[in-house]
């Protein structure tokens, strides 16, 4: 199943440590983004893949072309000649998606055996296109 998450792609932030209690927690911005991804999956009619099955995930992160780019550079971005080599790092983008879909698209992210993650420029606002599928043995 494929679904879209509107808004600029974000990466998984490092866990934070509480000085007072000594506990580890996920930053609020990351937790909110994970919730947004999970809601988009469920709103698209997503159903969990059984725990005895393998999962494949494709994540395409689309970033808005900066307004400061020249006409030539914007055109190169539109034709995928220039790609967004910028933050967030691709591994952090993938990690936030995998964690968000835990217990929603699959029981545990250990079921994920195939991944693809790419960064592109978008002619409009930024978004994520995520595809989750069962991988046959």
Residue ranges and their predicted role:
Residues 1-137:
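Acidic, proline/glycine-enriched N-terminal capping motif
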């Amino acid at each position: 199943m494929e679904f879209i998450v509107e808004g600029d792609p974000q990466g998984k932030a490092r866990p934070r440590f509480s000085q007072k209690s000594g506990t580890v927690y996920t930053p609020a911005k990351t937790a909110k983004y994970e919730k947004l991804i999970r809601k988009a999956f469920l709103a698209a009619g997503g159903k969990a893949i059984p725990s005895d099955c393998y999962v494949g995930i494709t994540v395409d992160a689309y970033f808005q072309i900066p307004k400061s780019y020249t006409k030539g550079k914007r055109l190169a971005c539109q034709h995928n000649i220039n790609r967004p080599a910028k933050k967030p790092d691709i591994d952090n983008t993938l990690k936030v998606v995998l964690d968000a879909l835990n217990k929603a698209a699959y029981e545990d992210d250990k079921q994920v055996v195939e991944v693809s993650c790419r960064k592109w420029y978008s002619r409009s606002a930024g978004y994520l296109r995520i595809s989750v599928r069962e991988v046959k043995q």
